[in-house]
C-alpha cells in the first residue's frame, strides 16, 4: 500500500519512477534475469526500499546496498513505516559508505 501511494504521488509531481524494478545478475554462464527487486527507483538515481517492520533488521540495509551496487548508484533511502514519527523511520544508505539516519 505505501509503495503504491508513494509511486502515485511521485508520478503526480512529475518525477520519473520505476516500481518493482527487476535486477538481473550474471555468474559465469548463468544469467538470472529477476534475481533482485527494487521497490522504487526515482529518476534513475535514487533507490527507495519501503518496509513496515519493528525492529528493523540490518539485513535490509545490506539489501539496499546490493541494489545500489547492481545499479552502480551511490545513494538510496530505506523508509520504515512502522514508527511513531516518520522522521525516525527514514535512513539514507550509501553504497560502501555506511548508513545514516536523517
Regions picked out by a protein language model, each given a short descriptive name:
Residues 1-16, 92-102:
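Solvent-exposed, charged helical/coil patches
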Residues 11-29:
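A short acidic/basic microdomain associated with nuclease active sites
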Residues 17, 38-56, 67:
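Conserved catalytic cores of phosphodiester-cleaving nucleases, focusing on short active-site segments
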Residues 27-31, 87-88:
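Short, solvent-exposed polar/charged micro-motifs at secondary-structure junctions
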Residues 51-102:
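Nucleic-acid nuclease catalytic cores
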Amino acid at each position: 500500500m505505501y509503495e503504491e501511494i508513494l509511486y502515485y504521488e511521485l508520478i503526480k509531481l512529475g518525477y520519473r519512477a520505476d516500481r518493482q524494478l527487476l535486477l538481473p545478475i550474471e555468474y559465469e554462464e548463468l544469467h538470472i534475469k529477476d534475481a533482485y527487486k527494487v521497490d522504487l527507483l526515482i529518476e534513475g538515481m535514487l533507490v527507495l526500499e519501503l518496509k513496515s517492520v519493528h525492529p528493523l533488521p540490518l539485513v535490509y540495509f545490506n539489501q539496499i546496498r546490493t541494489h545500489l551496487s547492481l545499479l552502480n548508484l551511490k545513494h538510496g533511502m530505506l523508509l520504515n513505516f512502522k514508527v511513531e514519527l516518520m522522521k525516525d523511520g527514514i535512513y539514507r544508505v550509501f553504497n560502501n559508505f555506511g548508513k545514516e539516519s536523517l
